[in-house]
Swiss-Prot record:
PANTHER family according to UniProt: GUANYLATE KINASE (PTHR23117:SF13), GUANYLATE KINASE-RELATED (PTHR23117)
Protein name as it appears in the record: Guanylate kinase
Similarity comment: family membership: Belongs to the guanylate kinase family.
Gene Ontology molecular function, alphabetical: ATP binding; guanylate kinase activity
Compartments reported by the entry: Cytoplasm
First-level EC class: transferase
Function: Essential for recycling GMP and indirectly, cGMP.
Catalytic activity: GMP + ATP = GDP + ADP
Residues reported to bind ATP: 16-23
A GO CC term assigned to this protein in UniProt: cytosol
Organism: Thermosynechococcus vestitus (strain NIES-2133 / IAM M-273 / BP-1)
Amino acid sequence: MTSATPQPGQLIVITGPSGVGKGTLLRQLRQRHPELALSVSATTRPPRPTEVAGVDYYFVSVEEFKAMIAAGQLLEWAEFAGHYYGTPRQPLVQLIAQGKTVILEIELQGARQVRQSYPQARHIFILPPSLAELEHRLRSRGQDSEEAIARRLAQAETEIAAAPEFDVQIVNDDLEKSLIALETAIFSPAP
């Protein structure tokens, strides 16, 4: 009797402006679907109060991050809001080879890199109902300076303009509706 080879998994790339609610959607999604694997990104930004190293991000120094780039250890990487973010390649590849559906939450530049290096990934863009609502969400987090909020809003306009590049766009105006749309996008057969 031979053991079955696991079927390859899939990579789901989720992108959207800062403050659009990606984290909230993904937390809810993982509660409903614990079988989904979340890719853990590396970043040079400091941890937020509720974040756990190795779970939410791998928090590394700029020097460590640059060494990862030089060694080809990142599937994608980008600089955003003054910090580096990137996806360690090996853990992601291992999970997909094990048949897992892996969720990769990254920003636009990284998503574009993944489209080039891993074209079979499904790309989902989360949109805010409006820029005014996005600004409200950013301010209500209470963690960014006025300058950072202005930078994030300017970046959001650029990112929103790129939404048509994605396989699926979801407007996050109602958590439950958005979650159902996200589930549909992830679990429906690829077109």
